[in-house]
Amino acid sequence: MTGGTGLVGTHLLRQLVSEGRKVKALYRSAFPAFLTKEEIQKIEWVKGDVLDAHALFHSLDGIQQVYHAAALVSFNPYRKKELFKINIEGTANVVNASIESGVKKIVHVSSVSAMGRLRVNTPIDETMFWTPETSNSNYGQSKYLSELEVWRGIGEGLKGVIVNPSLILGASDWEVSSSKMFKSAYDEFPWFTEGGGGFVDVRDVAKAMVTFMDADISGERFIVSAENRYYKDVFTRMANEFGKQPPRKKVSPFLAGLVWRIEWLKSILAKKEPLLTRETARTGQVMVEFNNEKLKRFLPSFQYTPIDQSIKDVCKELLKRYETH
């Protein structure tokens, strides 16, 4: 597995280990903070990077299945070059190494950001393919182009499935990735936008990936999304679970332009990813719904975790970790 130290990778490793599977995971510098010592010891760790094609090839010796979860998630325009290099070139390296090493199947973690936006006021599904639009983020473009590398691999004989999760809720380092949403709720970030989108529990993403890997399914991509919710509702529930004040100041499009600039300056001073960028300020003003019927059709017994339960579970785990350390 690549990306074993990230949000999806950590929970995927936990599921694979709990099922008694033999797992080899790539890591760059540190083991996942949210895995137990016992879980870490059950995994064969290989130090490496998806940008090191030579090391990737050797790490796949004897491997039959590959989960590719390594990616950079950033909406900071100043990281575009880094974003494209890791997400596109990294995926190409994983696909090439898999083919050369005789890997039988790959499950690739993409994103709903890589889906098209052609039909107005219609839930997005897997038939809507990418078109160049100003509303597309650099991150979404990088994930779309990384998908093309996986499709190329499938065309060259590699079995593969692509999963496109919506906004993932899970316990992880809340200074990075989508877990920053929980940190902002804990810190009583006062602003909210009128928009919304799809949400899914990270445990469901992991469960779907393992199920697709084991199933006789290839050459397909699937939206993995439990519910469509407004951002204000989700942030309010997070704040309530933390015992904090929920967001109370509505961000108009004009005000969003001011807020993202303030957040940008704060991020420079703190040397951290900004909570709000020009891209996220723009997309946060609209409700984008996602259709999850294809996954249900291929996996009739698959059950999603209700988002309210996901929020409750994640807040509980984060409080346990950060308020006791």
Feature names for model-found ranges:
Residues 134-161:
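Active-site Tyr-X1-5-Lys
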Residues 1-19:
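N-terminal Rossmann NAD(P)H-binding glycine-rich loop of SDR-like oxidoreductase domains
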Residues 81, 86-138:
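Conserved Rossmann-fold NAD(P)-dependent oxidoreductase catalytic core, especially the SDR/UDP-sugar
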Residues 208-275, 292, 297, 306-307, ...:
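Mid/C-terminal beta-alpha module of Rossmann-like enzyme folds, strongest
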